[in-house]
Structures are given as structure tokens and as C-alpha cells.
């Protein structure tokens, strides 16, 4: 199985390095309110559960980090992050298909 948390974490580190800002602690409230990277409520509900929970934190960090990037790099990082989040949500949905959430 692909380690989405690792992929997302590496992407975040690369983006942070690029804009030279440091990682900060983020609360789950901030995650739920600020995660503009995630495109839909259903994706949020999938990612909010299980092993992919950390991806929401990464999404919010990415959202903050990319505000400091030039527009062409912002698009690149947001698209890459969105791809990872969608794959993780799909994997989580498959895993939980027979469970009541």
C-alpha cells in the first residue's frame, strides 16, 4: 500500500523549503475550517477517518505555505497535494466500505 502520509509529508517539506518557512503546530479545528485544498465534503469525511487523518493537517499546512509561493508554483503544489488527498480518500473509502462510519 502506498504511504500517502509520507508522500504528503515530503511534498510539504519541499514546499516549505522552497518558501523558507517553518512548520507550525495546527489544531484539528483549523484543519476542518481551513482545508481549502480538499475539494468536497465527502473527501473531508473520508480523510477525517483512520490513518489518513494526518493528511488533513498536511493539507492545511500546504494551504498556508502555498500562499507564499509564486502563482505557477502554487498551482503545482496544490494539484500534487490534491492528487494525494484524493488517492488517500479513495483508499480510505475502499477500506471502510463495509463499515458504518
Where are these regions (language model features)?
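A short, Lys/Arg-rich alpha-helix, primarily the initiator
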Residues: 1-25
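Short, charged recognition helix plus adjacent turn
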Residues: 2, 73-101
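DNA-binding alpha-helical recognition surfaces that contact promoter or target DNA
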Residues: 10, 14, 42, 46, ...
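Surface-exposed polar/charged interaction patches
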Residues: 18-22, 50, 68, 72, ...
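Short alpha-helical "recognition helix" segments of helix-turn-helix
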Residues: 26-35
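Recognition helix of helix-turn-helix/homeodomain-like DNA-binding domains
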Residues: 36-54
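Acidic, low-complexity, intrinsically disordered interaction modules
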Residues: 42-45, 59, 65-69
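Short, basic-rich loop-to-helix N-cap that marks the start of a DNA-contacting helix
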Residues: 50-64
